[in-house]
Design a protein with these regions (language model features):
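Surface-exposed intrinsically disordered loops and tails
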Residues: 32-44, 104-111, 274-279, 311
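Surface-exposed or flexible loop/turn and strand-edge residues in extracellular/cell-surface modules
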Residues: 4, 12, 22, 67, ...
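Right-handed parallel beta-helix
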Residues: 93-96, 125-136, 152-165, 183-200, ...
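Right-handed parallel beta-helix/beta-solenoid
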Residues: 1-57, 326
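Flexible, charged surface loops at secondary-structure boundaries
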Residues: 18-22, 61-66, 84-87, 121-123, ...
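N-terminal extracellular ligand-recognition/capping segment immediately after the signal peptide
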Residues: 56, 64-116, 133-138
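Extracellular beta-strand/beta-solenoid scaffold signature
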Residues: 80, 105-121, 137-148, 165-184, ...
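N-terminal segments that cap or nucleate solenoid repeat domains
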Residues: 58-67, 322-326
Length: 326
């Protein structure tokens, strides 16, 4: 049985792409015998034409709506341009396993280029991203996101998404790790890490790990879900937040199931007032925190025109909150 066939079966059974899988592509550091992954692929009779040295060139070879899969070999690729992921049902899968905190030994994409607004900008439909790290460390106010999602039906499993990693970024309004933009309906993430306590202190009240950015009436993304995910950032003021929404940023239900929220401050010098907040006079929505914990935060939400629900163990009447007792 060939390696390509093995990976097709794995994708169908483990990742859940079904049996209608299109072409597969591989990304290595170099197409050279000194590259262990390239050499391995060639010994397994993977054709030269299926092996690429950047995710962008592999993506260019993929065909929209064919359920093509790009397999990224372990290692971080440094990019100098935004990757516009506009094709539908075109998937990116890291072969280094679920991504842990700390990008250096991960599998994915990194940018420190000051002109890269979003490392990946997904506008395609029903795309999946598995076991991938994406980091934007550009020291510029234009470097807003690591991953911007403006396509519906996106699934993200076992990924690590880190933005606002430089001081200039982190002090910019709406800077984020993950941006849910207009068109980003039906988003689903599971076992992912968003943000980091190792890079960039949030320096603006509207910068956050997760930002809902839509400004178009009637286009607010809805029906999203995060399962067993971690959201974390450094803070230097009580007014910072981990989730921020513009006035028309989201609609209907957004569910956080068994997620952790961590606002790190040295020596607990600051306690975040609320995990989530929004621009004044927002559209009505329901944000549910089911069996979640928020560390070094006072509440999930103080007040809102939308509705915030917390379900789970209570501490001082604020479900799942963990604060320093003084």
């Amino acid at each position: 049985m060939s390696l390509v066939r093995d990976l097709r079966i794995m994708a169908a059974q483990t990742i859940g792409l079904g049996v209608g899988i299109g072409e597969v592509f591989f990304v290595v550091t170099a197409r050279d015998t000194t590259d262990a992954y390239y050499s391995y692929l060639r010994t397994k009779y993977v054709p030269e034409g299926m092996i690429y040295t950047t995710v962008a060139t592999a993506y260019a070879a993929a065909v929209s709506d064919r359920n093509d899969i790009i397999f990224k070999m372990p290692g971080i690729e440094t990019v100098a341009a935004e990757l516009d992921w506009a094709k539908n049902r075109t998937h990116l899968v890291g072969l280094g396993g679920p991504q842990q905190k700390g990008y250096e030994s991960g599998t994915g994409l990194y940018s420190s280029t000051i002109t890269v607004a979003n490392v990946i900008h997904n506008t395609g439909v029903n795309n999946q991203f598995h076991n991938i790290t994406v980091m934007n460390a550009g020291a510029n106010a234009t470097c807003l996101s690591a991953f911007k999602n403006a396509g519906y039906g996106t699934r993200m499993i076992g990924c690590q998404i880190i933005g606002h990693a430089a001081a200039t970024q982190a002090a910019t309004a709406l800077a984020n790790s993950l941006e849910i933009a207009e068109g980003g309906y039906y988003f689903y993430a599971e076992k992912c890490n968003f943000g980091s306590t190792d890079f960039g202190t949030l320096g603006a009240n509207t910068a956050a790990v997760l930002v809902f950015s839509n400004t178009t009436g009637g286009a607010a993304p809805s029906d999203g879900k995060f399962v067993n995910c971690n959201f974390s950032a450094q803070i230097n003021a009580t007014t910072r937040c981990l989730i921020y929404s513009t006035r028309l940023g989201l609609d209907r239900d957004w569910i956080f199931d068994r997620c952790e929220f961590y606002a790190f401050a040295a020596n607990h010098g600051y306690v975040m007032t609320q995990v989530a907040t929004n621009e004044a006079n927002p559209t009505t929505y329901d944000m549910v925190f089911k069996d979640c914990v928020a560390i070094n935060c006072t509440e999930f939400r103080t007040d809102s025109n939308g509705c915030t629900w917390t379900i789970g163990p209570a501490a001082d009447g604020k479900g799942g909150i963990a604060v320093v007792v003084t």
